[in-house]
Regions:
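Feature for soluble, non-membrane regions of globular proteins
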Residues: 2-221
């Protein structure tokens, strides 16, 4: 039990962190992961569950996101924080030997189709993160016509929400709590380093899901 493990879970449950807190070192530090997961993520979850009970919401979580304009702001902020981070943990994986971590399979095919090269793809993500003023997320998304692009969203917004209407393939948290302890104000260095721990197997799985038109509730498994 870490010093940060102090939240009880209610209705929607947490996605278990699929690696130890220090497993993403040296790219993401242990203390950041502890605080990020146990304070921020579980905090969003607790507040989301409170809001769901308060407003008597009985929809699957992605349906809530897709119809978020129906709900008060605390549902958007905390539900978005819950959904975004639940995906984010699975989109990362340890790389202890610091091997060259590059996309493969369907991820690489889509990157070449839509961005030309993996290097150019990374540059688009870096640029989007630099232009995202304040807190938010940078996403690689698939649209309903099968095309993909880079999207930046404010705060805890995500691609499922009505104004974006796309399917998240990869999401990177650019809130300061995701990187400040290790990188200080250098968001760009954080983004460049996080490519070392992207879980391309999970991204491939999400591309297959998107191609099968799974634009619905089955993202949390």
């Amino acid at each position: 039990m870490s010093k940060y493990d102090d939240y009880e879970l209610v209705k929607f449950s947490s996605v278990r962190l699929p690696y130890k807190y220090d497993a993403l070192e040296p790219f993401i530090d242990e203390e950041t992961m502890q605080i990020h997961y146990n304070k921020h993520y579980l905090g969003y979850l607790k507040k989301f569950n409170t809001a769901v009970e308060k407003y008597d919401i009985n929809e699957p979580v992605i349906k809530i996101m897709q119809n978020i304009d129906k709900y008060p702001i605390e549902v958007r902020d905390n539900g978005g924080g819950y959904v975004n981070h639940s995906m984010f943990w699975k989109m990362l994986k340890p790389n202890p030997k610091k091997k060259n971590n590059v996309p493969y399979g369907i991820s690489l095919i889509k990157i070449i189709e839509d961005f030309g090269t993996y290097g150019q793809f990374k540059e688009y993500i870096i640029e989007a993160s630099q232009k995202r003023f304040g807190s938010g997320w940078v996403w690689w998304v698939m649209n309903r016509d099968g095309s993909t692009n880079i999207l930046a969203t404010p705060y805890q917004d995500n691609p499922y929400m009505p104004e974006y209407q796309s399917f998240p393939l990869l999401g990177i948290d650019v809130w300061e709590h995701a990187y400040y302890l290790k990188y200080d104000a250098d968001r760009t260095r954080y983004i460049k380093n996080i490519f070392n721990v992207i879980n391309w197997e999970e991204v491939n799985r999400r591309i297959v899901s998107a191609n099968q038109n799974i634009f619905d509730v089955r993202i949390m498994n």
